[in-house]
């Protein structure tokens, strides 16, 4: 399932991130805010659990989120920009990390680092600002699905139609939430118009 979110504030922040001379500091702040908004939307269907609590008029039962059932998995490096915002939505969620690198010649991706908590029966939310060819997300999903999660969601600021099609065809059970579906990929596998090299831009590694 693919959901392109229509909220005007999400569109505004995605387009703010496109501006070439946006400082690294402002870009990190913008992506943190996008992480909050996208995760908030992605968890709209989550089920609550009844719990008895003490109130000013005695013990009462209300519905609450079991935060420990949720696991955020940012894709290094750029996915870290979403993590702080995601944890503001669900502060007690568990966090795992996947480092996945794409070969810029073959466009194939491979895992170079994996540190995941228990995923069996959990709701996993993958955090990655961009979904381009879908190669990185495919590798992440294959790794995560080995551990029998209850549900997997993936959130992105932008995505290319080609990558969305690839993931939807191979992983029909995965829910993808995206701030904006961009035009296309270029011959190097970059999203057009995209965000440039978001990892480098976030951490002021280079100017493109």
Curated annotation (Swiss-Prot):
Binds 1 Mg(2+) ion per subunit. The magnesium is bound as Mg-PRPP. This is Uracil phosphoribosyltransferase. 5-phospho-alpha-D-ribose 1-diphosphate binds at residues 77, 102, 128-136, 197. Signal peptide: none annotated. Keywords: Allosteric enzyme, Glycosyltransferase, GTP-binding, Magnesium, Nucleotide-binding, Transferase. SUPFAM superfamilies: PRTase-like. It is an enzyme of class 2 (transferase). InterPro entries: PRibTrfase_dom, PRTase-like, Upp_B, UPRTase/APRTase, Ura_phspho_trans. Catalyzes the conversion of uracil and 5-phospho-alpha-D-ribose 1-diphosphate (PRPP) to UMP and diphosphate. Belongs to the UPRTase family. It comes from the Bacteria. NCBIfam families: PRK00129.1 (NF001097), upp (TIGR01091). It catalyses: UMP + diphosphate = 5-phospho-alpha-D-ribose 1-diphosphate + uracil. HAMAP family: Upp_B. Uracil binds at residues 191, 196-198. GO terms for molecular function: GTP binding; hypoxanthine phosphoribosyltransferase activity; magnesium ion binding; uracil phosphoribosyltransferase activity. It holds the Pfam family UPRTase. Its EC number is 2.4.2.9. Pathway: Pyrimidine metabolism; UMP biosynthesis via salvage pathway; UMP from uracil: step 1/1. Allosterically activated by GTP. GO terms for cellular component: cytosol. Its cofactor is Mg(2+). GO terms for biological process: GMP salvage; guanine salvage; hypoxanthine metabolic process; IMP salvage; UMP salvage; uracil salvage.
